[in-house]
Swiss-Prot record:
Entry EC no(s): 3.5.3.6
Gene: arcA
Name of the protein in question: Arginine deiminase
Catalyzed reactions per annotation: L-arginine + H2O = L-citrulline + NH4(+)
Taxonomic source organism: Tolumonas auensis (strain DSM 9187 / NBRC 110442 / TA 4)
GO MF annotation list: arginine deiminase activity
Length: 409
């Protein structure tokens, strides 16, 4: 592990360590008939997506970032007997597998090498992968190519299932059922893997509990510094969860202020970071057609640390964020393009979803020519990743990364 302590203390301070997930079996199992249910807009050319993801990783490593891949982390975690039992106890159950096949399936999975089991847990397990005939009502219902465990292609977007907020982490209850198992697997890595075991403070969230309507995803969470966290409240992160998150952060003494930004519920603006990200200093990039409509709510601890104080802030979001960080104003680089149609296209292709490696250095997709040019004109160095394949899941550099160690600014 890096010599630095786990924790993410800003959006643009030097990035020291990050978790990613290279495309693999889960993406080879995307089809035109199932990609919608698995939250992808299209199927991948997987071999090219892997090459492009390797470019993404290489750019980070070239700047000194320690890059960890969840495929390897999970494989190593599964080589620990206690961890394997914990994961399979919760993943291979009557509720998931049905009555009649749990014993045979569990006995087989207990003997698999860690890297093979990890590939099935992320990539999905089909009936034709089994060395035995499926049994029970569920097993016979599936047919020869049915999924016993559905694939998790959205694990590519490691940002969402957990969020490091200053010195601790949240284990996020995801909005869609297709993504909920990601949080369980990440929780196991944090609990059992030697890089994390005994070093992680969980601030909120538990993948073993039913959070009902309290859903939260990391694309909406930004620890911006100055003991403040910005949280998007839209399609994926609910006010029920954000209130609980604020309570937990205040009780742990993690922050003094939570700013909740209400965003339209739409596929194009599924998370705050699809329309707004930080680039360094007071420079941000934003899809202003959406960002200008956001309403901000200020949450702070109540008297004696009890309950929450809650106020709607009448100011535009950019002014709220500038004040929280001690700036007179933000320099906003809008989505590039001369027409509304061009700007909408570049936002759809994750033009505003950049990952800062350090102040003034970001990673973005190469396809967003106008937005990248605008950022470069503002003095931001843009390291470009091919985005034709990776962008089919609607996520850019920030979405494809879960920072675990980042400096303050």
């Amino acid at each position: 592990m890096s010599e630095h302590t786990l924790g993410v203390h800003s959006e643009t301070g030097i990035l020291r360590q990050v978790i990613v997930c290279r495309p693999g079996l889960a993406h080879r199992r995307l089809t035109p008939s199932n990609c919608d249910a698995l939250l992808f807009d299209d199927v991948f050319w997987v071999k090219q997506a892997q090459k492009d993801h390797d470019v993404f990783v290489s750019l980070m490593r070239a700047r000194g970032v320690e890059v960890l891949d969840v495929n390897q982390l999970l494989a190593e975690t599964l080589d620990i007997a206690e961890a394997r039992s914990w994961i399979l106890d919760h993943r291979i159950s009557w509720n998931h597998i049905g009555v009649g096949m749990v014993s045979d399936l569990r006995a087989w999975m207990d003997e698999l090498p860690g890297h093979v089991l990890a590939e099935f847990l992320i990539g999905g397990l089909q009936v034709n992968d089994l060395p035995f005939d499926p049994s029970g009502l569920f097993g016979n219902h599936l047919g020869p190519y049915g999924f016993i465990l559905p694939p998790l292609p959205n694990f590519l977007f490691t940002r969402d299932n957990s969020s490091w907020i200053y010195g601790g982490v949240t284990l996020n209850p995801m909005y869609w059922a297709a993504r909920k198992p990601e949080t369980l697997l990440t929780a196991a890595i944090y609990q059992f893997h030697p890089k994390f075991s005994g070093k992680v403070e969980v601030l909120w969230g538990d993948p073993l509990k039913d959070h009902a309507l309290a859903t939260l995803e990391g694309g909406d969470i930004m620890p911006i510094g100055n003991r403040t966290v910005l949280v998007g409240m839209g399609e994926r992160s609910s006010p029920q969860a954000i209130g609980q998150l604020a309570n937990a952060l205040f009780e742990h003494g993690t922050v003094d202020r939570v700013v909740a930004c209400q965003i339209p519920k739409s596929r194009a603006a599924m998370h705050l970071d699809t329309v707004f990200t930080f680039c360094g200093g007071n420079v941000v990039t934003a899809f202003t057609e959406v960002a200008d409509q956001m309403v901000c709510y200020d949450l702070r601890p109540g008297a004696g640390g009890k309950h929450l104080t809650f106020n709607q802030d009448p100011r535009p979001m950019f002014d709220v964020v500038a004040e929280a960080l001690g700036y007179q104003s933000l320099t906003v680089i809008p989505t590039g393009g001369d027409t509304p149609a061009e700007r909408e296209r570049e936002q759809w292709n994750d033009g505003n979803n950049v990952l800062a490696l350090s102040p003034g250095v970001v990673i973005g997709y190469d396809r967003n020519d106008d937005t990248n040019a605008a950022l470069e004109s503002a003095g931001i160095e843009v390291l470009k990743v091919p985005g034709a394949e990776l962008g089919r899941g609607r996520g850019g550099g920030r979405c494809m990364s879960c920072p675990t160690i980042r400096d303050a600014i």
